[in-house]
Regions:
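Gram-negative (and chloroplast) outer-membrane scaffold detector with strong preference
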Residues: 32, 56-143, 147-149, 174-187
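Short, flexible helix-coil linker/hinge segments at the edges of structured domains or between repeats
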Residues: 157, 162-173, 180-182
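Long C-terminal intrinsically disordered regulatory segments enriched in low-complexity Pro/Ser/Thr
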Residues: 152-154
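Short acidic, glycine/proline-rich loop/turn micro-motifs
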Residues: 40-44, 80-82, 119-123, 162-165
Length: 187
């Protein structure tokens, strides 16, 4: 009798303390980008460097089915020769799948969207923006029965074509990698 009670207690405790999103009816996640490393070059062949990133990631889903998400962030660009503050604005819409693995929450996804340069907060007149695509993964660890803390990695591909001047038709390669940190809620 005591053995059955102990086994039942362990099983109940495991379900309560180590619940994952696979048991939840709805999962909701928010996050922020921590770093954006550019891997491409501008039209002159110079390396594009990030000077900080701000924004958000949001995703919502249900178990077994793919979920949807949205990323929106701005990356300041280091530019010694620029006369204006230059930023890269990225907006993505994502489709993701939460793999049903106990204890950890592993998410894989893809996204599509747009990138554009901003000059002092407005669209730069020398470009119309470009299309962007990404793949990403997120690894979450439960911190409480209904919450998890997750670290994400995004690999973004995008090129922005110059539409005026002597560089017309040339493209800035603004692809790179974005690391993020977030928290997930499971209802």
């Amino acid at each position: 009798m005591i053995r059955k009670i102990i086994i039942s207690f362990i099983a109940a405790t495991s379900l309560i303390l180590f619940s994952t999103q696979a048991f939840a009816l709805l999962n909701f996640s928010v996050g922020v980008p921590l770093s954006h490393t550019m891997t491409g070059n501008d039209t002159a062949g110079n390396e594009i460097k990030s000077d900080g990133v701000s924004g958000y990631f949001v995703q919502v889903g249900v178990p077994i089915l793919p979920g949807i998400g949205m990323d929106s962030y701005k990356t300041k660009i280091k530019c010694a020769a620029c006369t204006v503050e230059l930023e890269l604005e990225t907006s993505m819409y994502n489709l993701y799948y939460l793999l049903p693995i106990p204890i950890i929450n592993l998410t894989v996804g893809v996204g599509a969207g747009k990138t554009k340069f901003l000059c002092d907060g407005s669209d730069c007149s020398w470009q119309d923006g470009g299309t962007a695509s990404q793949w990403y993964t997120s690894l979450g660890f439960p911190i409480l029965p209904l919450f998890d803390l997750h670290l994400s990695y995004r690999s973004v591909s995008s090129k922005i074509e110059t539409t005026t001047g002597s560089d017309k038709g040339k493209k800035d390669d603004v692809g790179g990698n974005v690391m993020g940190l977030g928290i997930g809620f499971n209802f």
